Each structure stands twice: as structure tokens, then as C-alpha cells.
């Protein structure tokens, strides 16, 4: 049995202020090691090989950009590279705390340097550059070499503020406050922080969805799981000196604004319509979250650096009204779009599904008609058919998943029965999950739109529609999250729990497989018609995670494909799509934006010369303004040619193209039937 005994106590710091592990941490670490050994899906031995991975993860999590440690520090840490497996098994956390305490000294030294030089008068006429991404660089061999890295860091930050319109005194004020706050945050580090970073360096060696949460962070995790927070509905994560948005809650203010995307970085926060914008670069993510949260109905303004943009690039400001994230906000919604082409008129129904949810309380009270994604979509289909739509599109973009049972039952609205998904657990046992719905709710033309942030339950639904050839799947390759997690409180594994609270462990226990036997893990769902994408598989999604569980295949479940889609139809749709990619201005603009973002992401070095940076900034603005004018004039021309303007009024190029493809699909289907 996985049960441990022991009293939980201990001090966080010794008399010199050095951080030390508590007895609770020693107990927790032994429990975590045993849970991963007994229950995790991946059969991985805690050995020298994994020890090296944990070592690299820990160093990277502390100083991934190589701004603090010296090369001599790393050499001194190497003695632990192949020892962490043994120390973890014994509940020994000395190596982690030794490394972290050295890190604290180096960090404090760098912050002292930054504060001493934040008022320097930099020469912006020099032709020198700054490498902001130092992941591939070596560690500095001396303090003088690290000083030069930080001189350029400060110069780049000052230049960015100058280019945004800040006066010299304001630049100094912002930088000074930034690093004073950073130093204040560092002083708040405690042994729980060290332990959480170290345990997640261990869990990340198993897979990216296995995580440890301290008791404090466990409370936040549970609140987010219940969607009970009053705020903007965004999940935040530390990303070096920045706080990154990693998830948007369906129906939350951030999601509904359509101005914020995953991977955006929060660099400033202001309260109310006229509150001062506070610089939050260098803040801890929990402090950023605390600043964003507030009473329902109040306004918060965020200054964001778009995901993929280089430091110093143009930022955007978004105003949001805080609200409580309620179940109703995750409900599917529908609209009817009129589209005309070549003398043919099409009435298209669009159903947006932001989340797969089920209201358990309502289910207990109303077992025949409870609130759920499936029941909502079923009602929307009935309403759309009452409006005589020619086809229906299911929009699953940015739908990160939810209740598995809802993905299965919603598939049943379009499929006549059979297996929807297979699940394989850590013991190798496979369970098939079938659609139990009697009959189908919709038999007409169907397409499903996905993107890189469609994950988990979304991938199950899209994969089933594609495998059964029930509809056409369009958009981008999905995230590739095909695993199942369990969440357990570590206190559950103690024979005699003490009074002190322990954290939570979320760990992977199973994998999803499509009816064909192909896993959705790692590869996700590849659409039948693939759109140009901002997000590359190498940088975003499951395939970008080094420890992600691999794709594999099991035996296919018995199933009979339908005849709604065939290769001839897909060839026609692909041809029409390719033609529009070359002619449609919105799609041309989209491809231009993608190319520019790709160029920005590949850029690891920026100029520290004012004139050159100003020219680059002005060139980007000129191109952006020119495209806005072209787009406005084209919209006016199109409005004169087409009687129904509803499609032309749409700003969403992906949605417009999906509607056009569904119209092509409807036309191709008519020709097939003769």
C-alpha cells in the first residue's frame, strides 16, 4: 500500500536566512515518487537517465535564459546530475535547495546591478545588438561577461520605453520601480517555492500534464476547476521575467473580448478607466493574478505583448470588466449566416462550442433534460433546421476540452451509433466508449472547424466526425493532448495525517485513441482542409513538449464509415481553397501576418540603435495602415456586388473561409447525388 507515516513540521530558513526543506516536503517528495512509480501511465524508472532530465529541467526552470548562473556554478552542480534519483528515493532534498540558494545569491547580485545602472545614459547611436533569447548561448564565464549581458538588457528595455514615447526621467522611473519590485518579490521566496519548482522538474520528466501544486496553489487550481473565480477568466504562468496567458476560460471576459490569445504576455495592469498602468515585468505570476482579480463589475486594463512578438515590439491594451465565470458562459451559441456566390444563395448555421460541459447538479434534478453541451447543441440544431439552413458548421476553435462523456454524446447527434473513442489505461486495458444516443439530430452537410488550441474532448469529436466520414474537418492541426489525468491530495496517502496541509498531484493515467486505433496524443487531428497557421507544431502544442507521451496506435474498433465525404469531394474543396488563398484579400492579409510573425519568432537579436529600431517600427506601422485602407476599400466594393452583407461584415478570415468551404461542400454534394 502507498501509505506513509510521519509528523509534519519544520522551519523554512536557518539562522543565516538560507532556505531549507521542511519535514512536510520530505514526506511529500516520497509520496510523489511512489505515486509516479505505481500509477503514472508512462513506465519510467527513476534512474540516472531520468536524474539527468530532472537536473536539466531544474536548472532551466531557474535560469533558462542564462542570465544569472556562471559557468563555474553549473560545473559545481554537475556532481548532482546522476544522483537526484537516489536522493529523491530517500526523501533527500539537499541538492535542490543547495542549487536554489546559489541561484538566490546570483539573482540578488544581478538585481543590485540593474538598480545601480537603471539610470545610466545609454548611447543609442552605436551600432550594437542585443540577443534576448539566450537559450542556445553558453553561461557567462565571468562576472564581467554577465555585466555586459545585463548592460545590454537594460539598454534594450530603456530603448523600448523610449520608442513607446516615455521621457528620459520616466524611463529611469519605470526601470527602477521594475527592479525594486523584482527584488521585493525575490525576498518573498520560501521553501514551498523551491519545493514546487523541484517537484515539477521531476514530474515534467514523466509528461507535461503531470504537475505538483503546493497547498496554496492547490486552492487556486481547485477554484479554476470549479470556474468560481471573479476575474477575467485567464490562466497565467511564469515565463522568465514575464507572466504568460496559457488558457482562456470559455465565456470569460478575456475569451469574449476576442482581443486576447494564448501565449500573450502581461506587461502592465491598470485599474479602472483612468488608473495608472503599472509595469509588471519581473512580477511573480501569482502577484500578477492577484492584481488582475477584483470585484465583479469593475474594470481592469491589461497591457499585452503579443505571443511570439520580440521584447520591445508594439504592445496592445485591452479593457475588461471582471465577472464571475459561470457555467452558462460556456454554453454553445448559434448564428445564421447568408452567403451568395455565382448566383447561388446559401443559409449557413454556425454553432460555436467553447467547452464540453455538464451540470452535474442539474443532471441529478432533471435526468431527461439537464444542462450540458450535447443538450444545448441538440436544441440549437432544432432551431437552425427551423430556419431552413443548408448546412451546419461546428466551431471548436480554442475549445480546450472538458467532459469526455459530452464529446461522445455530442458525436451521437451526427452519427448513427458505434464506438466514438477508445481509452487505454496504465495497465494496458482498453475500453471502448460508444454513442448511446438513439437516432441522429442532424443529417445535412456538416463541417467542423478546429485550430491549434482545440484539444482533448474537441479532438475526440473532430476525429470521430472525420473517421466516420460524416463531415469535413477544416482549420489547423489540433493541440495533440490525448491523455487523461487524475488529481489526488497527497494527504490521502498518509496513514496518520497531521494537521499541516499537503499539496496536490495531477498525474497522467490513460491515453485516448480514435476509432481507427490512432492516438490523438502528440499528433492531434489533422484537418481535411488545412489553413495557414500562426502556430507551428514545433513551437506550440503537445509536439513542442520534450517529455510529451508519443503517438502510437492500437487495434481499430469495428466501425462503418458513412458516405457524406469522399476523396473526390475533398479534392474539389482543396482546389477551391487553394484558389482563394491566392486571390482573397483577407486570406492574403492573413498569410502576410503569419509570415511576419514567423519572421519575428525567428529573430533572436534586436538592434540597440535608436534610428534603426525607429525605422523598423515605422515600417511595420506603415504596412499595417496600408492594409487597413485596402481592407476597407475592398469591403466597400464587395458590399456593392453582394446583396447580403452578413458574410462580408465578418472580420474573422478563418470563419469566412470555413463558411465558403461549407457552401462548396453543399454544391459538391448536390453534384454527387446527380
Predicted regions and their residues:
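Extended, small/polar residue-biased N-terminal targeting/export presequences
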Residues: 46-52, 59-132, 183-238, 299-301, ...
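Acidic/histidine-rich, surface-exposed loop or edge segments in extracytoplasmic proteins
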Residues: 12-17, 29-41, 79-83, 177-181, ...
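PDZ/PDZ-like domain segments forming the peptide/carboxylate-binding groove
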Residues: 44, 60-61, 82, 96, ...
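Bacterial N-terminal signal peptides
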Residues: 1-7
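Extracytoplasmic/secreted envelope proteins and their assembly/folding machinery
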Residues: 26-33, 47-59, 74, 81, ...
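Polar, glycine-rich mid-to-C-terminal structural blocks
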Residues: 457, 469, 474-540
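Conserved functional hotspot residues or short segments at active or partner-binding sites
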Residues: 117, 166-177, 514-674
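Cleft-lining beta-strand/loop regions that shape enzyme active-site pockets
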Residues: 11-13, 20-21, 37-47, 184-191, ...
Amino acid at each position: 500500500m502507498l501509505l506513509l507515516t510521519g509528523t509534519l513540521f519544520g522551519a523554512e530558513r536557518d539562522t543565516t536566512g538560507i532556505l531549507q526543506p521542511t519535514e512536510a516536503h520530505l514526506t511529500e517528495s516520497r509520496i510523489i515518487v511512489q505515486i509516479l512509480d505505481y500509477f503514472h501511465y508512462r513506465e519510467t524508472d527513476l534512474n540516472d537517465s531520468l536524474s539527468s532530465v530532472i537536473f536539466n529541467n531544474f536548472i532551466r526552470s531557474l535560469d533558462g535564459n542564462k542570465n544569472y548562473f556562471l559557468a563555474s556554478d553549473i560545473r559545481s552542480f554537475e556532481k548532482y546530475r546522476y544522483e537526484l534519483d537516489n536522493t529523491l528515493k530517500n526523501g533527500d532534498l539537499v541538492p535542490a535547495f543547495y542549487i536554489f540558494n546559489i541561484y538566490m545569491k546570483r539573482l540578488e547580485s544581478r538585481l543590485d546591478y540593474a538598480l545601480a545602472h537603471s539610470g545610466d545614459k545609454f548611447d543609442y547611436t552605436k551600432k550594437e545588438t542585443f540577443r534576448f533569447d539566450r537559450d542556445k548561448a553558453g553561461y557567462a564565464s565571468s562576472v564581467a561577461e554577465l555585466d555586459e549581458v545585463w548592460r545590454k538588457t537594460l539598454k534594450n528595455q530603456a530603448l523600448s520605453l523610449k520608442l513607446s514615447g516615455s521621457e528620459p526621467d520616466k524611463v529611469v522611473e519605470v526601470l527602477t520601480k521594475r527592479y525594486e519590485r523584482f527584488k521585493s518579490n525575490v525576498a518573498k521566496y520560501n521553501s514551498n517555492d523551491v519545493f514546487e519548482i523541484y517537484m515539477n522538474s521531476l514530474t515534467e520528466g514523466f509528461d507535461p500534464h503531470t504537475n505538483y501544486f503546493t497547498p496554496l496553489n492547490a486552492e487556486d487550481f481547485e477554484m479554476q476547476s470549479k470556474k468560481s473565480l471573479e476575474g477575467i477568466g485567464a490562466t497565467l504562468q511564469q515565463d522568465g521575467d514575464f507572466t504568460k496567458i496559457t488558457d482562456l476560460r470559455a465565456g470569460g471576459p478575456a475569451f469574449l473580448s476576442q482581443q486576447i490569445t494564448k501565449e500573450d504576455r502581461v506587461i502592465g495592469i491598470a485599474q479602472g478607466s483612468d488608473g495608472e498602468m503599472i509595469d509588471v515585468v519581473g512580477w511573480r505570476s501569482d502577484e500578477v493574478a492577484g492584481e488582475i482579480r477584483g470585484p465583479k463589475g469593475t474594470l481592469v486594463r491589461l497591457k499585452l505583448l503579443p505571443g511570439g512578438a520580440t521584447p520591445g515590439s508594439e504592445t496592445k491594451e485591452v479593457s475588461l470588466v471582471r465577472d464571475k465565470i459561470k457555467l452558462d458562459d460556456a454554453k454553445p451559441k448559434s448564428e445564421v449566416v447568408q452567403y451568395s456566390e455565382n448566383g447561388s444563395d446559401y443559409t449557413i448555421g454556425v454553432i460555436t462550442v467553447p467547452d464540453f460541459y455538464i451540470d452535474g447538479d442539474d443532471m441529478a434534478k432533471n435526468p431527461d433534460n439537464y444542462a450540458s453541451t450535447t443538450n444545448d447543441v441538440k436544441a440549437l440544431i432544432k432551431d437552425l433546421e427551423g430556419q431552413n439552413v443548408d448546412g451546419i458548421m461546428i466551431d471548436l476553435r480554442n475549445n480546450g476540452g472538458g467532459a469526455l462523456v459530452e464529446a461522445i454524446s455530442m458525436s451521437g447527434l451526427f452519427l448513427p451509433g458505434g464506438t466514438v473513442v477508445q481509452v487505454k489505461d496504465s495497465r494496458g486495458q482498453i475500453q471502448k466508449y460508444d454513442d448511446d444516443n438513439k437516432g441522429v439530430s442532424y443529417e445535412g452537410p456538416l463541417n467542423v472547424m478546429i485550430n491549434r488550441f482545440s484539444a482533448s474532448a474537441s479532438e475526440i469529436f473532430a476525429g470521430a466526425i472525420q473517421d466516420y466520414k460524416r463531415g469535413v474537418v477544416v482549420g489547423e492541426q489540433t493541440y495533440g493532448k490525448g491523455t487523461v489525468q487524475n488529481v489526488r491530495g497527497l494527504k490521502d496517502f498518509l496513514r496518520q495525517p497531521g494537521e499541516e496541509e499537503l499539496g496536490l498531484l495531477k498525474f497522467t493515467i490513460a491515453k485516448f485513441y480514435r476509432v481507427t486505433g490512432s492516438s490523438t496524443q502528440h499528433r492531434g487531428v489533422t484537418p481535411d482542409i488545412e489553413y495557414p497557421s500562426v502556430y507551428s507544431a514545433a513551437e506550440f502544442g503537445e509536439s513542442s513538449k520534450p517529455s510529451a507521451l508519443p503517438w502510437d496506435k492500437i487495434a481499430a474498433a469495428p466501425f462503418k464509415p458513412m458516405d457524406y465525404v469522399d476523396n473526390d469531394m475533398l479534392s474539389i474543396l482543396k482546389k477551391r481553397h487553394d484558389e482563394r488563398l491566392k486571390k482573397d484579400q483577407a486570406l492574403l492579409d492573413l498569410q502576410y501576418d503569419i509570415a511576419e510573425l514567423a519572421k519575428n519568432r525567428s529573430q533572436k537579436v534586436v538592434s540597440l540603435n535608436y534610428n534603426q529600431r525607429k525605422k523598423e517600427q515605422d515600417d511595420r506601422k506603415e504596412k499595417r495602415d496600408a492594409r487597413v485602407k485596402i481592407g476597407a476599400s475592398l469591403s466597400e466594393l464587395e458590399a456593392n456586388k453582394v446583396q447580403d452583407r452578413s458574410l462580408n461584415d465578418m472580420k474573422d478570415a478563418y470563419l469566412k473561409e470555413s463558411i465558403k468551404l461549407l457552401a462548396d461542400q453543399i454544391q459538391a454534394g448536390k453534384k454527387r447525388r446527380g
